[in-house]
Design a protein with these regions (language model features):
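Large intracellular
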Residues: 2-8, 19-164, 247-292
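Helix-termination/interfacial motifs at the ends of transmembrane alpha-helices
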Residues: 4, 11-14, 18-40, 154-244
Length: 292
């Protein structure tokens, strides 16, 4: 086996070091000040406390760099497609798929399994189309099940891989948030120490402690962003990917069992009854009411 350079790891390590270095020398801007407002209205001025580009840079940049080190570059670049799938809604019509399988079963039982070959191009599902084509060419039902199960396992493995990347990103985010906070506290304490070395005339204790507390609040913002991205972005996305994967795999399991049943020349009514066991009871009752 030939070894090759993993450029994703190199890019991640170098970019991570640069990210931390930039955070260390980030130019200091004016510290936002809370201006209390009268009455019970919202204090919109307080929002300025939470807009810290440096904090977002450390958390997001650090998470991306660590992910590049942990995973191949190709897998990280594929995250765009993963996030797109999360945003787009996809409906899994289990009963509709069962109806399509029953139609194929009726045609196969009437005209033979080879008659399904003419309608392969009309099947939208790639997994189902490949499965029907395989059923036409494969005589051994056990081998057919093995091939379809292998395909299904490969799909499941890819789904788990995408979920794993997002879960690792969720784990990295609070860690980089804490790293940014520690970095901010170190810079803040050093500034306080340098201020204390000035003459007593220039050194105002009240002002320095006010600056210290203000700087501590700014430093803690990075932890806030780390926790926010982990629990509001990455973990919910990973959970949604898991739910969607479970539904997709169940739909493909229905297809798998349906193709095996068609290959075994089972009666369409028995095929429907068997496949409907995959469907939730409430959805099953809705389907029965439509038929009535």
């Amino acid at each position: 086996m030939k070894s090759e350079w993993d450029f994703g790891t190199l890019i991640g390590l170098l970019a991570g070091v640069v990210c931390i270095f930039v955070a260390m020398v980030w130019p200091e801007g004016d510290t936002p000040i809370i201006i209390p407002t009268e009455g019970s209205g919202f204090r919109w001025e307080q929002l300025s406390w939470f807009f810290q580009p440096q904090s977002v840079f450390i958390v997001v940049g650090g998470v991306l760099c660590a992910t590049l080190v942990n995973y191949p570059l190709k897998a990280v670049l594929g995250l765009g497609k993963v996030f797109k799938n999360v945003i787009l809604s996809e409906k899994f019509d289990f009963t509709g798929m069962i109806d399509n399988i029953v139609v194929l079963a009726e045609k196969s039982r009437k005209d033979g399994l080879l008659s399904l070959e003419a309608g392969l191009s009309e099947i939208d599902s790639v997994f189902m189309r490949n499965g029907v084509e395989l059923a036409i060419n494969e005589r051994d039902s056990s081998r057919l099940r093995t091939f379809l199960s292998m395909d299904l396992n490969n799909i499941s493995t890819r789904h788990i891989g995408a979920q794993e990347i997002i879960l690792y990103m969720a784990a990295y985010a609070p860690a980089f948030g804490m790293l940014g906070t520690v970095l901010g506290l170190i810079i803040m304490m050093n500034k306080f120490q340098m201020s204390g070395e000035t003459s007593s005339i220039d050194f105002n204790v009240a002002e320095q402690f006010a600056s210290l507390l203000s700087g501590m609040g700014t430093a803690l913002i990075t932890t806030f962003y780390g926790v926010f991205f982990a629990n509001m972005v990455f973990l919910p996305i990973a959970g949604k990917l898991k739910r969607r994967s479970e539904n997709e795999l169940m739909l493909k399991n229905i297809v798998l069992e349906g193709i095996i049943s068609i290959h075994g020349r089972e009666h369409p009514i028995l095929i429907r009854e068997k496949l409907m066991t995959f469907v939730a009871l409430s959805e099953r009752k809705m389907s029965e009411n439509k038929e009535v």
